Amino acid sequence: IFILSCTASKNTFGKKYEILDIDSLGSKSYVAAIRNIDISEFKEGELKKENISVKYRLFSPEVSSKSQKFPLVLVFHGSGAIGNDNTKQMYALVKNWITPENKEKYPAYILAPQFPIRSSNYHLDPNRNVLASESNEHLDLVLQYIDSLKKQLPIDGSRIYVMGFSMGGSTTMNALSKRPDLFAAGINISGISQFDKMEDLKNIPLWYIHGSLDTDNSPKSNLQFFEEMKGNGKIFFWDCKDKWHNNIASKELIDTIPKWLFKQQKK
């Protein structure tokens, strides 16, 4: 275990890092400012198939040449944003991508679906004695939409990323497990892992983040996944000390996400 401050690199595969938020007051104000960013630049839409539907918002970067291609970032929300107002899912991990600095340094399509029901449900894995997650047809609809977007928009198919918080972190692992061919990397923040497709994920860069004091989603599931995957996969773990479920966001985390994702590319 490595205990590091903000100044050191913390992204070596196979390593677990204890993260100390040394400027918690500054982090809170920084995250609060991002939460207040206007979302009018995101186009509203709705996906429908048979008896299911999923609303979404999509941000498109500024295209300056026909040859330009951009990453796509899929961001899943937690259970507190379940609904159909197409607004509650627009939390800091979505809005961070459209700060003036990030729009310039990390231009990307940002897709933020809002699920009308839980996108992941949990059950006890009897072999591991930890929770495991599983998804439903609403996730399938979103993944099919990405296939459609790839044909319509100048998306770089080697740089499609998926990330999420809480239930969204779980759904991130469900999406990777369903479509390992689609994604270049994934970030699971405070979610619950899926264990039955681990072999398919060993070549996908994974970043796990969890608060050590989290009682909403115990870190046990993600720690178990990390321990099993660290020897032959591409995964590293941020163990955020003295963080619980709903205060996991920090300036360091939010700043590091686009930097790390943009370095990942499918070969």
Where do the protein language model's features map onto the residues?
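A domain-start/cap signature at the N-terminus of enzymes
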Residues: 6-72, 170, 223-226, 233-235, ...
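Short, solvent-exposed loop/turn and secondary-structure capping segments
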Residues: 68-70, 84-88, 121-125, 174-175, ...
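Primarily recognizes the serine-hydrolase "nucleophile elbow" in alpha/beta-hydrolase
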Residues: 147-152, 158-202
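C-terminal catalytic histidine-bearing segment of alpha/beta-hydrolase fold enzymes
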Residues: 189, 196-197, 205-209, 213-267
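Short, proline-enriched alpha-helix->beta-strand connector loops that line the catalytic pocket
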Residues: 106, 201-206
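The conserved beta1-alpha1 loop
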Residues: 76-78, 210
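Active-site machinery of serine-nucleophile hydrolases
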Residues: 79-139
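Gly/Ser-rich "nucleophile elbow"/oxyanion-hole loop immediately N-terminal to the catalytic nucleophile
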Residues: 65-67, 123-165
